[in-house]
């Protein structure tokens, strides 16, 4: 792994840790001002396309409100050049307690100037579990 790739891998590990702390300020500090986030689902073939810090921040905050106990259990991280992949398992209970989600996923990243320019999220489409399942 090159030094360049190592720095990007460390960035992705820190990004995942910030998600698990629900630290949106830290997340946004790791993204470019003109960042793009392609959501898990949406009207477009790539999900919804959110552009810029304000839109991406709002989406991250909404996820954390919707799933107050959300965690992304980090799996392998792969980096080559200006592209990266982070595998994870998402777990979270809906805020109203009605259901729990547990599913594997990954993010595809594009880096620019030492930050994340694009985050493209993918997750297995699994039915919600009963909320009382641990």
What kind of region is each of these model predictions?
Residues 1-7, 23, 57-134:
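A beta-strand edge to alpha-helix "cap/lid" segment located at domain peripheries
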Residues 14-15:
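Generic hydrophobic alpha-helical segments
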Residues 23-39:
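Short, well-ordered alpha-helical segments enriched in acidic and aromatic residues
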Residues 22, 51:
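Residue-level signal for the nucleotide or nucleotide-sugar donor/cofactor binding architecture
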Residues 36-50, 64:
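A short gly/proline-enriched turn/hairpin at secondary-structure junctions
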Residues 8, 52:
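Hydrophobic (often cysteine-bearing) scaffold residues that line and stabilize catalytic clefts
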């Amino acid at each position: 792994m090159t030094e360049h790739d190592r720095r990007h891998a460390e960035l992705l590990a820190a990004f995942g840790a910030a998600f698990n702390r629900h630290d949106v300020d830290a997340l946004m500090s790791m993204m470019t001002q003109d960042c793009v986030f392609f959501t898990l689902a949406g009207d477009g073939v790539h999900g919804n396309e959110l552009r810029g810090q304000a839109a991406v921040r709002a989406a991250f905050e909404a996820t954390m409100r919707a799933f107050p106990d959300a965690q992304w259990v980090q799996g392998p991280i792969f980096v080559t050049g200006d592209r990266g992949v982070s595998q994870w398992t998402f777990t979270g209970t809906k805020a109203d307690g009605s259901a729990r989600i547990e599913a594997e996923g990954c993010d595809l990243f594009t880096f620019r100037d030492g930050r994340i320019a694009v985050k493209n999220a993918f997750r297995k489409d699994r039915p919600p579990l009963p909320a009382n399942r641990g």
